[in-house]
Every structure is written in structure tokens, then in C-alpha cells.
Regions:
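Surface-exposed cleft-lining segments at the edges of enzyme active sites
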Residues: 47, 128-141, 167-176
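Short loop/turn segments at strand-loop or loop-helix junctions that form parts
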Residues: 38-43, 122-123, 162-165
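C-terminal active-site subregion of NodB/CE4 polysaccharide deacetylases
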Residues: 1-94, 101, 172-322
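Histidine/lysine/aspartate-rich catalytic loop segments that bind and position anionic ligands
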Residues: 145-150, 154-181, 185
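A short, conserved beta-to-alpha structural element at the edge of catalytic cores
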Residues: 114-135
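Generic enzyme active-site microenvironment
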Residues: 94-95, 161
Length: 322
């Protein structure tokens, strides 16, 4: 069934390629070119699963993006949306979770090629080396990044972002205190870990039910510049630039090309997000001052005395050929 679906999608892509190319040129001429933000989890050549892509596949994806699109940072993507000026079709590269294997090939390759990337991690999994629940349930508890690896990646130019403290499902959160712990406190912890300010936050799972109003509000109040979802959508001029919409870096190359070439059919099926959240009304005002105070406390604390020793060998890997 998957083979037939891929074949059908490939046929459709081939037949519509010229029309899509013209549409993309027209949008660019009007400064309305779409921005696609890709997210990956794990790049590795062992223990394959639904959230792992091989090294060769990943490099093929990025090389394709370099050839056909402009690869930009999340900050540049936001700037274009804020200024209502997107002159070229663009792509951003992001990672979620924080798997140790990413430091063996993918991240060093991105650094060597000076490709911007934002790398989202769950702080408690990094701090304690705790595997993710979904990996444990699958019988394969994969290693997570260490603090030293994150510091080395940041030193190499990779932007580190927040992915909560415990990879929590926000659809199950019932109190403001839980939300604050997973966003505000975790942001402060991560800033202390790496000695850099944290500007971006990726919501675990990132489906509409997790993208609650309280999540956006708490993130905004503690100094986060943008919140990333993961339900598959383009970023278009006129969209809210604080909400960065992302697309899965699908290992099936034809599906990836179909997304990046701007499939306007997908605009018809964009889900609506929750518009009401009792957490905002009940608890947010009484903790506003605390959230404002901690927005940069982590970076300040580290600057006042914590060590920033980086083991550069963590990122020294053999040359990878695309």
C-alpha cells in the first residue's frame, strides 16, 4: 500500500511540477514565498525506527534544500514573516528531542557546511541521561545528548532550543505550576547548562491539541521568541510569526519534495488550534512577575562564574561524503 501511495504521489508531483514552479516564482515576485521548517529527530545508521533517518538520507535532504531553496535560521524566518517580505522560497532545519547519535554525523556535517540549525532538547533527559519513554516502550532505550555535547554544538554555531524538561504532553497538563516547570524553569536550566540565551521552544508532539493558548502565553511571558508546532504546515506572509509551523523531514524523499514544492492542497486541511484555556484565566496573572524575572536568569548565572569547558573532540568526526 505504501509503495502504491508513493508511486501515485510521485506521478502527481511529476505532472504538477511546472505549475508548482510557476506558482512559486509568482509568490516570490510578490514577496510572499513560503518558508518550510523541517524537523528531524535522530540521524543514525543503526536501530532504525519511525523517527530515525539514515545519514545518507539526511545529507540528501539538506543538499536538495541547498540546491533548490535558501536555507535560513529560525530568526531570519521570523524576520521575513514580521516584515511581510519573503522574497525567496526558504527552508529551516530543526531537530527535536536530543539524541546522542546526532553528534556523530549530522551535527558535525551541518557545522562544517555552515548550515543554520536549531536543536531542541528536553532538559531533564539531558541532565540525567534518561532515555525517552517512547524508546523504552519500543524496547530500545537510545542514548540522549550530554551537556558537554550541547555546549560543543552551540560553540560550533548550532542554536540550542527548548523542548520542555520532561518531553511532556501538554494535552495532559492540568495546573499552571506544571506548565511553568516545563517551560519557564526548563528554559532557565537550559540557559545555565549551555551559557547561551534560549530563544525558541518546540512543543513535544506539536499537534493542535498540544498547542494550547496557555502554552503560547507562558512561553511569550518568559522571553521565548517563537513557539514551534509539528503538525505539518507552511509559514506564509500574514501568519503569526510567533507560531512557527513545521513539517516532518520525511525519509520518503518524494513526500519531502512534494511538501517543499508548495502543495496548495495542504492549505485546505490546516487544523484549527484551541482558542480557550482555563489555565490562562485562573493562574497566569498571579505568576506573571516570576515568569518575567527568570527570562534571562540562566544566562546571567552562568556568566557570573560557571565553567564553559568544551571538549572539541565531541564534534570531531570523519569526513562524510554526500
Amino acid at each position: 500500500v505504501n509503495f502504491l501511495r508513493t508511486l501515485a504521489l510521485g506521478t502527481r508531483y511529476t505532472l504538477s511540477r511546472h505549475r508548482r514552479s510557476k506558482r512559486m516564482r509568482d509568490l516570490a515576485a510578490a514577496n510572499q514565498a513560503p518558508i518550510s521548517v523541517l524537523f528531524y529527530h535522530r540521524v543514525a545508521d543503526c536501530h532504525p525506527n519511525d523517527w530515525t533517518i539514515s545519514t545518507d538520507q539526511f545529507i540528501r535532504h539538506v543538499e536538495y534544500c541547498r540546491e533548490h531553496y535558501e536555507i535560513i535560521s529560525l530568526g531570519e524566518a521570523q524576520k521575513r514573516l514580521q516584515e511581510n517580505c519573503s522574497p525567496r522560497p526558504a527552508v529551516c532545519i530543526t531537530f527535536d528531542d536530543g539524541y546522542a547519535e546526532n553528534m556523530q554525523s549530522a551535527i558535525p556535517w551541518l557545522i562544517r557546511n555552515r548550515i543554520p540549525c536549531t536543536y531542541f532538547v528536553a532538559t531533564e533527559h539531558v541532565r540525567h541521561g534518561r532515555p525517552f519513554a517512547h524508546d523504552v516502550e519500543a524496547g530500545c532505550p537510545l542514548a540522549t545528548n550530554t551537556i558537554e555535547q550541547l555546549r560543543a554544538a552551540a560553540k560550533g554555531g548550532i542554536e540550542i532550543g527548548l523542548h520542555t524538561a520532561n518531553h511532556v504532553d501538554f494535552n495532559t497538563i492540568t495546573t499552571y505550576q506544571e506548565l511553568e516547570s516545563e517551560i519557564v524553569d526548563a528554559k532557565m536550566d537550559l540557559e545555565m547548562m549551555i551559557g547561551e540565551p534560549i530563544d525558541y521552544f518546540a512543543v513535544p508532539f506539536g499537534m493542535p491539541e498540544q498547542m494550547r493558548p496557555a502554552v503560547f502565553e507562558v512561553a511569550r511571558r518568559c522571553g521565548i521568541r517563537g513557539v514551534c508546532s509539528a503538525f505539518g504546515a507552511y509559514n506564509l506572509v500574514g501568519d503569526d510569526p510567533f507560531h512557527i509551523r513545521r513539517i516532518h523531514g520525511d525519509p520518503d524523499f518524494i513526500r519531502l519534495r512534494n511538501w517543499l514544492s508548495f502543495d496548495e492542497r495542504k492549505l485546505r486541511y490546516m487544523p484549527s488550534l484551541p482558542t480557550e484555556d482555563i489555565l490562562v484565566e485562573q493562574n497566569l496573572s498571579e505568576r506573571q512577575d516570576e515568569a518575567d524575572v527568570v527570562s534571562s536568569a540562566g544566562a546571567v548565572a552562568l556568566a557570573n562564574g560557571d565553567s564553559l569547558f568544551v571538549d572539541s573532540s565531541l564534534l570531531q568526526q570523519p569526513t562524510i561524503h554526500a
